[in-house]
């Protein structure tokens, strides 16, 4: 690989991480309510915690920004490199930035909205299908975390079904498993509450 391509590759990864780490939820909490979302509710800077402690309009804006961060990272990667493996690296960089933002002492969101954006960028069909699963579970359970976990678990299956020549070594399949693991890891506390039957539903403060 030429030095220029190496430079562009590292630049793209850095930009993807920076996009992912943009603290939209944190800014919304500070600007609109004067609160640090890392210290209230679930401690997440994602749209769900914004919904519970800032408001519906702010949560929608944060959600759209976070989705855009994921889409942007993939579009930039696709514009510079043809390799699916590199698209995956940039997508994971964006997810890592969202979960562990350097600007907020490594404490950010749970990668759901940004993950949706990443997979909309990789395969809009898979992204929309996972969103459909999220909405279906949310409609029946009224529990955001359960909906997020269900959508994350569906990703490898949806990606496998979407590829004509799928294998477990396919870069996008690997990405779907990586994203699933990251989302499940960030929902550890939610999983415990779900098992105990005390996970809050929409409209309740946790």
Swiss-Prot record:
Q: Which reaction does it catalyse?
A: an acyl phosphate + sn-glycerol 3-phosphate = a 1-acyl-sn-glycero-3-phosphate + phosphate
Q: Which residues cross the membrane?
A: 6-26, 57-77, 86-106, 118-138, 143-163, 165-185
* Gene Ontology biological process terms from the UniProt entry: phospholipid biosynthetic process
Q: In which pathway does it act?
A: Lipid metabolism; phospholipid metabolism
Q: Could you name the Gene Ontology cellular component terms for this entry?
A: plasma membrane
Q: Which Pfam families match?
A: G3P_acyltransf (PF02660)
Q: What class of enzyme is it?
A: transferase
Q: What is its EC number?
A: 2.3.1.275
Q: How does it sit in the membrane?
A: Multi-pass membrane protein
Identify a single GO molecular function assigned to this protein.
acyl-phosphate glycerol-3-phosphate acyltransferase activity
Localization in the cell? Cell inner membrane
Assigned keywords, A-Z:
Cell inner membrane, Cell membrane, Lipid biosynthesis, Lipid metabolism, Membrane, Phospholipid biosynthesis, Phospholipid metabolism, Transferase, Transmembrane, Transmembrane helix
User: Which HAMAP family does the annotation name?
Assistant: PlsY
Q: Which PANTHER family match?
A: GLYCEROL-3-PHOSPHATE ACYLTRANSFERASE-RELATED, INNER MEMBRANE PROTEIN YGIH
Family the UniProt entry places it in:
Belongs to the PlsY family.
What exactly does this protein do?
Catalyzes the transfer of an acyl group from acyl-phosphate (acyl-PO(4)) to glycerol-3-phosphate (G3P) to form lysophosphatidic acid (LPA). This enzyme utilizes acyl-phosphate as fatty acyl donor, but not acyl-CoA or acyl-ACP.
What is known about its subunit structure?
Answer: Probably interacts with PlsX.
Q: What is this protein called?
A: Glycerol-3-phosphate acyltransferase
């Amino acid at each position: 690989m030429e030095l220029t391509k190496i430079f562009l590759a590292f630049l793209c990864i850095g930009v993807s991480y920076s996009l992912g780490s943009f603290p939209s939820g944190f800014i919304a909490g500070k600007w609109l309510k004067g609160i640090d979302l890392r210290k209230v509710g679930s401690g997440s800077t994602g749209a769900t915690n914004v919904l519970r402690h800032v408001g519906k309009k702010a949560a929608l804006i944060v959600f759209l920004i976070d989705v855009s961060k994921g889409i942007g990272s993939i579009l930039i990667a696709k514009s510079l490199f043809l390799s699916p493996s590199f698209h995956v690296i940039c997508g994971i960089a964006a997810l890592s930035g969202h979960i562990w933002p350097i600007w907020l002492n490594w404490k950010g969101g749970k990668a759901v909205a940004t993950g949706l954006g990443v997979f909309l960028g990789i395969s809009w069909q898979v992204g929309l299908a996972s969103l459909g699963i999220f909405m279906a579970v949310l409609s029946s359970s009224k529990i955001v975390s359960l909906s997020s976990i269900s959508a994350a678990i569906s990703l490898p299956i949806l990606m496998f079904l979407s590829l004509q020549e799928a294998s477990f070594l396919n870069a996008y399949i690997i990405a779907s498993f990586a994203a699933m693991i990251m989302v499940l890891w960030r929902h550890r506390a939610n999983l415990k509450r779900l098992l105990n039957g005390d996970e809050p539903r929409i409209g309740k403060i946790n």
